[in-house]
A protein has these predicted regions:
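C-terminal non-catalytic interaction modules
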Residues: 1-4, 8-15, 274-277, 281-341
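Conserved alpha-helical positions within TPR/SEL1-like repeat arrays
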Residues: 13-21, 47-61, 86-101, 112, ...
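Amphipathic alpha-helical segments of tetratricopeptide repeats
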Residues: 36-37, 76-83, 114-124, 154-164, ...
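Eukaryotic tandem repeat interaction scaffolds
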Residues: 178-290
Length: 341
């Protein structure tokens, strides 16, 4: 018995999500496009809204922020037309993540609030946990580490009660990053190891790649450069296979730091130039600021105070622009350590 077009579209969407989880991003995009083309613009609105949003998230995870934004906006149009509160709430949450990446934290917080309100009305418990986690990321950016940890812990407990391993791995990644920033390296290592077990059990190549990269940052911090290099290389190779520009840029930043720690300053500068170029089209202001901070560190190590100053001044402006007060204060101290002009 042949499938109807909506049934065929639903099957294609399922295959797209499976391909995405395996890291087969090009195949996933193609399957989403095939599904979207089959769906009727009058009768299949709920699935159309979901498919567009999931395709947008794939774009977002690859660093294609504007493409993600367009998909999310289209998804919301169809969600409004069919009256799906759940699809609307998910759409607002996704747009909030885009606003956060672009450094518009006020708009991001507004959208998270709207998403939470609609999700509550729709009874979307899992989404409320995701929003709680995302608000924790905002707090982390703003330097409210106690608040961020509380948000993460709340969402983690909710996802653990629901046996939602996928969501648990997301929250553990954010907790690991927070503990790395705070210098709680052993806790961060334990958190990342736990998350990696989950990601590998689920064959989730995307999450595993991100976790490996964030774990590499911990290895650098504790001086285990060989382990850091291996983790960074794994993440970079996987990201390049997926055309994941966001993770590629982050991995290049990490590799440049490893090179700097080993005294290969010229190579570190060359790697950072490639990374900065890779990051230019991503609209991720925080990542761009982190790249500039690294560029300043290596320039200072080379004895080039003028280049270091230029990079750190721009980094400080970017950190302040996204509300990252903790990082902006660190840059101010670095600038103060440079010799006067």
């Amino acid at each position: 018995m042949s499938l109807t077009e909506p049934e065929r579209a639903r099957e294609l969407v399922g295959k797209a999500r499976e391909a995405e989880q395996r890291g087969e991003c090009a195949r996933s995009h193609g399957l989403y496009d095939d599904a979207i083309a089959l769906l009727d613009r009058d009768s299949d609105l709920a699935l159309l809204a979901d498919a567009l949003r999931w395709k947008g998230t794939l774009h977002r995870e690859q660093g294609e922020t504007e493409a993600a934004y367009r998909c999310y906006k289209q998804s919301l149009v169809h969600a409004d037309r069919c009256g799906s509160l759940a699809a609307r709430a998910h759409g607002y949450n996704c747009l909030a993540i885009v606003a956060q990446r672009r450094g518009n934290l006020t708009e991001s917080e507004r959208l998270y609030s709207e998403a939470a309100d609609v999700a509550s009305k729709a009874g979307e418990v899992r989404l409320l946990g995701m929003i709680e986690q995302n608000r924790g990321v905002l707090m982390n950016m703003r330097g409210n580490f106690v608040g961020a940890e509380a948000r993460y812990s709340n969402s983690l407990a909710a996802f653990e009660r629901a046996n939602d391993d996928e969501a648990v791995s997301w929250v553990l990644n954010n907790l690991g990053m927070l503990y790395t920033k705070l210098g709680h390296y052993q806790r961060a290592i334990e958190i990342f190891e736990r998350a990696l077990v989950i990601a590998r059990k689920r064959n989730d190549a995307l999450v595993e790649s991100v976790l490996m990269l964030n774990q590499a940052e911990v290895w650098v911090a504790v001086g285990k450069l060989d382990e850091a290099e291996a983790a960074c290389r794994y993440s970079l190779e996987g990201a390049r296979t997926r055309d994941d520009h966001l993770t590629v840029a982050g991995a290049l930043k990490c590799r440049a730091r490893i090179e700097r720690e080993r005294g290969a300053y010229d190579q570190s500068i060359a790697t950072l130039r490639i990374g900065i170029f890779e990051a230019e089209g991503l609209e991720d202001r925080l990542l761009q600021a982190e790249m500039l901070r690294e560029f300043g560190q290596t320039s200072r190590a080379l004895g080039n105070s003028a280049e270091a100053r230029l990079a750190w001044v721009e980094a400080a402006e970017s950190f302040e622009g996204v509300g990252a007060r903790h990082e902006a204060a660190e840059i101010a101290l670095l600038l103060g350590s440079l010799p006067a002009n």
